[in-house]
Amino acid sequence: MTAWLDFPLALSPLVVVSMKGGSFGQGSEANGSPQLTGLSECGADRIFLQGQAGIPGIPGVPGTNGLPGAKGDLGPQGPPGERGSTGIPGKAGPKGDKGDQGEACSLASCQQQEAGAKDCKELLDRGETLTGWYMIYPTTGRGMRAYCDMETDGGGWLVFQRRLDGSVDFYRDWEAYKKGFGRQVSEFWLGNDKIHLLTSSGIQQLRIDVEDFNNSKTFAK
């Protein structure tokens, strides 16, 4: 009987035993062969023996990083963010061009002006009850447009300053305050010259109305 055995026990936990032209059985300590356990027959001439697991080997060297992937598609647009706080008012724009000269006053129109109301209170007494801009004549022949409040505190108040939303820049020089500036539909300053004309025509009463960001209102006069 010719037989040969291969025991790669030091390299792999799987031991393959091959036989040719004979049979193979369990060895014994008497004949000097180690006792084999876990034998199973597979086929006509091969027996597989499962040995104990070996010691784990040393980890291999890490491989190189792969190339960067392709750029992904843009994601969907996110929801709009919250509105930020109101910024600081910008600087005043350049001075506008001088307007065209008005027409001379005719005799009929001058007489009508002389008969005009001298202030908002007189307009209210004449039956004007809507708040808005009116033409008044504090002195004879000198008219001006003024905003009359016909609702607050009995009505008849002439508004010479109104600030609501910061849409008009109030950081201006003396010349601007002298002539007046702003927008009739929002914020404005009537003008120092016009205020002087109003206050010099008689005794006036001043009323100041204020409102905070919580819509709380108060006044003083």
From Swiss-Prot:
GO BP terms: namely: complement activation, lectin pathway
**Residues in the signal sequence:** 1-25
Per its UniProt record, what PROSITE patterns does this chain match?
FIBRINOGEN_C_2
* One Gene Ontology CC term in the entry: extracellular space
Keywords, A to Z, come to: Complement system impairing toxin, Disulfide bond, Hemostasis impairing toxin, Secreted, Signal, Toxin
Q: Which domain of life is it from?
A: Eukaryota
Q: Does the keyword Glycoprotein apply?
A: no
Q: What is the tissue localization of expression for this protein?
A: Expressed by the mandibular venom duct.
Residues in Fibrinogen C-terminal domain copies = 111-221
Q: Which family does it belong to?
A: Belongs to the ficolin lectin family. Veficolin subfamily.
Q: What is this protein called?
A: Veficolin-1
